[in-house]
Amino acid sequence: MGTSEAAPPPFARVAPALFIGNARAAGATELLVRAGITLCVNVSRQQPGPRAPGVAELRVPVFDDPAEDLLTHLEPTCAAMEAAVRDGGSCLVYCKNGRSRSAAVCTAYLMRHRGHSLDRAFQMVKSARPVAEPNLGFWAQLQKYEQTLQAQAILPREPIDPE
C-alpha cells in the first residue's frame, strides 16, 4: 500500500505579509482569513477572484506570454500591495499556476518596497515556491525595473544583500 501525500497548500509565505500561490488559492477562504489576507492580486485575465469576505481584488490583466507588458503594471500594483500591508493586512499574489506572473510581481514588490536586488528578491520567491520561474520576457522586464529603481536611488546600484 502506498502512502498518499497531502496536497501542498495553495499558497506559501514569501515574506511578512506577502504570499504567492496559484488560482486555487483565491478559493481557499478559510486559509485566506487565517493568513490575514486583505488583498488578492490576480495576475491573469481569466482566473476567478477571491471568495472571502473582506478580501479585495486587484486584477493585473496579463497572459503568461513573454510579449505581454507587465512592466507598466508593476508600480501601481506594488503601491496597492504596500498600502494593504501598511494598513495591517497581507497580500496574496496569484496566477493560474503560481509560477511565472505571480512570481514576477512578488519579485518586483520585494525590490520596490523591501529594497532587495532582483537576484535576492527572486531567491526569496523561489525559496517559498520552488516552481516559481518568470518567463524570459517578464525576467527582462524585471531587469529593466531593477535598473529604473537603481536610477531613482530606490535600490543601490551595487547589491548590499548579505551572501
Swiss-Prot record:
Residues covered by the Tyrosine-protein phosphatase domain: 10-151
Stored InterPro entries: Dual-sp_phosphatase_cat-dom (IPR000340), Dual_spec_Phospatases (IPR052103), Prot-tyrosine_phosphatase-like (IPR029021), Tyr_Pase_dom (IPR000387), TYR_PHOSPHATASE_DUAL_dom (IPR020422)
Cysteines paired by S-S bonds: none
Enzyme Commission number(s) from the entry: 3.1.3.16, 3.1.3.48
Enzyme superclass (EC): hydrolase
Keyword annotations: Hydrolase, Protein phosphatase
Alphabetical list of CDD domains matching this protein: DUSP28
GO biological process: dephosphorylation
GO molecular function annotation: phosphatase activity; protein serine/threonine phosphatase activity; protein tyrosine phosphatase activity
Pfam families named in the record: DSPc (PF00782)
Reaction(s) catalysed by this chain's protein: O-phospho-L-tyrosyl-[protein] + H2O = L-tyrosyl-[protein] + phosphate; O-phospho-L-seryl-[protein] + H2O = L-seryl-[protein] + phosphate; O-phospho-L-threonyl-[protein] + H2O = L-threonyl-[protein] + phosphate
Active site positions, chain numbering: C95 (phosphocysteine intermediate)
Gene3D superfamilies listed in its UniProt record: Protein tyrosine phosphatase superfamily
PANTHER family assigned to the protein according to its UniProt record, in alphabetical order: DUAL SPECIFICITY PHOSPHATASE 28 (PTHR45961:SF7), IP21249P (PTHR45961)
Role description: Has phosphatase activity with the synthetic substrate 6,8-difluoro-4-methylumbelliferyl phosphate (in vitro). Has almost no detectable activity with phosphotyrosine, even less activity with phosphothreonine and displays complete lack of activity with phosphoserine. The poor activity with phosphotyrosine may be due to steric hindrance by bulky amino acid sidechains that obstruct access to the active site.
Family: Belongs to the protein-tyrosine phosphatase family. Non-receptor class dual specificity subfamily.
Subunit structure: Monomer.
Name of the protein described by the UniProt record: Dual specificity phosphatase 28
Organism: Mus musculus (Mouse)
Gene, per the UniProt record: Dusp28
